[in-house]
């Protein structure tokens, strides 16, 4: 009896401790907050900007273990407007007819002048620019469709159109430019009078773009015959697409103000500027040769080039805001450009390999009937279906107003990796026809070019090991970012209040996720159903995905609890957790594609294979 009484007293004391806020904060939350601050890894402003950039979307539901199938199924199938469809049927087809990949890469080392003139005059370089400035103002889905189609014909053509419509001068001007900058540059970009390039990567800071050594010093100098407050900028950039032919160079560098001409801050931070190609001291024109693919790509340099502060995108007030600008704009471009281009390459490979396997006979039998080839064809078909599902849903998220940084990283990594596998399998099927380069070899050049997409916009090895879970955990978790912000709050009292609210919400969330994961595991997902949402034939897959999401949410929390700040250095573990989150998203894309395309019976096997 005394034991029961003692237990009741302990439970009552715990209840009082947890429910009486002042007592809980002083005896529990404050010591936990102290330990949390000690375990929290140091974070630079550039890291913080990268983590806080963009938005979270469906991937957050998956991370939290409670996918909102009603919300996902409510997303309408992306549709092209009449203008967009006409552009795809006419201008895009004509552009494809004008470019011969073999001629570009082995004879002329450039696209024909007629093709350059055509894509400029027909608005290919201004698809993201609003009509008010003379652009096309296409949807993200239309943009994706155009890039995917061009990629099936010519990589130099697709890249030359893709880059001006991705992260670069137009995108940055739209969001941060002054009215004067917008009114002058955007119409010229839309008409193709300006060819843009954006110089970020340096020889010594590739994927770690925040560490760029290029710098500018605020000073006074002569500009148009008058002494002007400006900056002397020194840069050495490489791998810049369109740099050899650009007329408007976007430039990222770290700006310093040692003499305090703009205020007391000496290190203003990364800054973005627009520099005309003929500005004194700008060096462009030399070219790289990326995997024998002759799109325009090359270095650019400048040594103490003086330019007025008005060259800064957004004017002098945006000095030092460049990293935030880049991170906030990166999500949209990364969700469209490389996923679309590589989905297009996979479509090309699937068509070539599938057709070849039907007509190529070995031992008086079409090779498509050999089990070894069937296995490759199945993987080609499945990955191509999956890639297009990811491409479409990623573009749809942009059209819904999202800027999903984690989704864009997932799409870039997994679409490019699967396109690489599709091309490898296709080359195995066509054999010698793919090895010997020539005008009739459709796959050889595409296979040779694959490392380009794997490497650019965040190398895949970096993306998988550091970004997918590292960024996803903080952005998608309902409480972790709030806890971090509370721990760093300058007002200690307010920080304690905020942390108390976030931490105990986190505890309830973890317990609920763990209980749900165990329950769904014990019942084999029988009660994890999505209700009446989704196709009947896919309900079991949706139940399994609900179960997996709950288990992942619980596992992610336990991992972060056990490792704390050291998780940042556990790259292989982070990569595996990122794989789980990414595959949950990929499965969702497949289910959404199958549902929104009308639940085509012939596609059910493809969808099940992907799942």
Labelled PLM ranges:
Residues 11-164, 171, 176-195, 207, ...:
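Amphipathic, small/basic residue-rich leader segments at the start of a protein or domain
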Residues 226-282:
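A short core secondary-structure module
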Residues 280-306:
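Flexible, small-/acidic-enriched active-site or ligand-binding loops
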Residues 299-334, 351-368, 515-536, 548-568:
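A glycine-rich, basic-preceded beta-loop-alpha segment at the flavin cofactor/substrate interface
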Residues 359-375, 595-602:
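Terminal amphipathic helices with adjacent charged low-complexity linkers/tails
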Residues 385-414, 427-430, 434-435, 564, ...:
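C-terminal helix-coil-helix/basic helical segment that borders enzyme active sites and/or dimer interfaces
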Residues 434-534:
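Glycine-rich phosphate/cofactor-binding loops in nucleotide/flavin-utilizing enzymes
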Residues 505-611:
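C-terminal amphipathic alpha-helical interaction region
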């Amino acid at each position: 009896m005394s034991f029961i009484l003692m237990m009741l007293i302990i439970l009552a004391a715990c209840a009082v401790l947890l429910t009486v806020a002042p007592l809980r904060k002083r005896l529990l939350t404050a010591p936990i907050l102290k330990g949390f601050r000690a375990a929290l890894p140091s974070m630079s402003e550039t890291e913080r900007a990268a983590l806080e950039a963009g938005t979270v979307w469906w991937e957050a539901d998956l991370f939290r273990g409670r996918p909102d199938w009603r919300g996902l199924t409510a997303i309408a199938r992306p549709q092209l407007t009449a203008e967009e469809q006409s552009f795809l049927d006419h201008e895009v087809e004509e552009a494809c007819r004008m470019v011969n990949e073999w001629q570009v890469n082995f004879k002329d080392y450039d696209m024909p002048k007629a093709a350059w003139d055509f894509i400029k005059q027909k608005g290919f370089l201004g698809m993201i620019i609003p009509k008010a400035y003379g652009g096309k103002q296409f949807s993200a889905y239309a943009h994706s469709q155009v890039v995917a189609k061009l990629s099936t014909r010519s990589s130099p053509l697709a890249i030359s159109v893709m880059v001006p419509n991705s992260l670069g001068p137009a995108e940055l001007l739209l969001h941060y430019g002054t009215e004067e900058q917008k009114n002058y540059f955007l119409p010229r970009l839309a008409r193709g009078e300006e060819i843009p390039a954006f110089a970020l990567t340096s020889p010594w800071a590739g994927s770690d773009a925040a560490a760029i050594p290029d710098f500018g010093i605020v000073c006074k100098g002569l500009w148009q015959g008058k002494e002007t407050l400006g900056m002397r900028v020194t840069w050495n950039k490489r791998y810049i697409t369109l740099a050899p032919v650009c007329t408007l160079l976007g430039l990222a560098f770290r700006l310093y103000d040692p003499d305090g001409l703009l205020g007391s801050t000496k290190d203003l931070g990364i800054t973005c500027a627009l520099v005309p190609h003929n500005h004194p001291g700008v060096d462009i024109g030399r070219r790289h040769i990326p995997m024998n693919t002759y799109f325009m790509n090359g270095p650019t340099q400048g040594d103490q080039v003086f330019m007025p502060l008005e060259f800064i995108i957004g004017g002098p007030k945006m000095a030092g805001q460049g990293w935030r600008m880049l991170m906030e704009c990166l999500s949209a471009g990364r969700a469209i450009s490389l996923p679309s281009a590589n989905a297009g390459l996979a479509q090309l490979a699937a068509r070539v390999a599938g057709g070849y396997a039907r007509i190529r006979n070995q031992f008086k039998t079409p090779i498509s009937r050999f089990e070894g080839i069937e296995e490759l064809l199945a993987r080609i078909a499945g990955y191509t279906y999956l890639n297009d599902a990811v491409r479409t849903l990623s573009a749809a998220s942009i059209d819904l107003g999202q800027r999903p940084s984690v989704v864009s990283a997932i799409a870039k990594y997994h679409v490019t990796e699967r396109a690489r596998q599709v091309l490898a399998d296709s080359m195995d099927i066509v054999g010698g026809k793919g090895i010997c380069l020539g005008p009739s070899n459709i796959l050889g050049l595409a296979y040779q070019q694959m490392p380009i997409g794997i490497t650019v916009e965040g190398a895949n090895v970096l993306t998988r090991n550091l970004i997918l879970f590292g960024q996803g955990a903080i952005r998608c978790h309902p409480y972790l970012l709030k806890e971090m912000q509370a721990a760093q709050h300058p007002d200690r009292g307010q920080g304690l209040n905020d942390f108390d609210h976030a931490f105990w919400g986190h505890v309830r969330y973890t317990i609920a996720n763990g209980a749900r994961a165990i329950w769904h595991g014990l019942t084999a997902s029988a009660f994890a159903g999505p209700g009446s949402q989704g196709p009947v034939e896919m309900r079991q897959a949706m139940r399994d995905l609900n179960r997996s999401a709950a288990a992942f949410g619980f596992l992610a929390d336990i991992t972060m609890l056990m490792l704390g700040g050291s998780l940042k250095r556990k790259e292989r573990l982070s990569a595996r957790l990122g794989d789980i989150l990414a595959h949950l998203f990929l499965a969702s894309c497949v289910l959404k594609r199958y549902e929104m395309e009308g639940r085509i019976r012939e596609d059910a096997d493809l969808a099940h294979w992907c799942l």
